[in-house]
């Protein structure tokens, strides 16, 4: 298998300072390479590749993603690459379940996708099948995404998207409701 996964065990704030999500695909036409930014799935802008003629294929793909989630949250999920030019949003790649409290580094030699060099590159990434040890109901953490386009000095970011989960103590309370003494209260005005 030519796909490698690596998860780096560093605090997220260190990783976040180290790199601000420079997610890029290396595309190839003949002997010529060009980097194309890889966008999050809820960012709708597409990117135009400035090469002349022919088709590009995705190769030497290296993706570095830092979800800003506490390592203590114990949240996992699958990272996917999707073709949004396809009406069904065909999945180009989906990883195994990964710990979202650590940086994800994905390396692939080839991606089964090609597009005309005169068109947009409609590949996005996202997360699915999120698993948490907590029940739904309370805000415990959020995820924020930042990335850069090519060699641009501008940094782009998405607003934080909140995930609702519940503290473990609250989950236990749901399973074992506390016995409350019935007390009468006067509601006289």
Curated annotation (Swiss-Prot):
Q: What does this protein do?
A: Cell-to-cell movement. Displays RNA-binding activity.
> Per the annotation, which location comes first and is thus the protein's main one?
host cell
Could you tell me the keywords of this UniProt record? Host membrane, Host-virus interaction, Membrane, Phosphoprotein, RNA-binding, Transport, Viral movement protein
Family named by the database record: Belongs to the tombusvirus/aureusvirus movement protein p22 family.
Recorded GO cellular component terms are:
host cell membrane; membrane; viral capsid
Q: What assembly does the database describe for this protein?
A: Interacts with host protein HFI22.
Q: Where in the cell is it found?
A: Host membrane
Instruction: Share the record's PTM remark.
Output: Phosphorylated.
One Gene Ontology MF term: RNA binding
Name a single GO biological process: transport of virus in host, cell to cell
Kindly give the Pfam families that the UniProt entry links to this protein.
TBSV_P22
Q: What is this protein called?
A: Movement protein p22
Domain of life, per lineage: Viruses
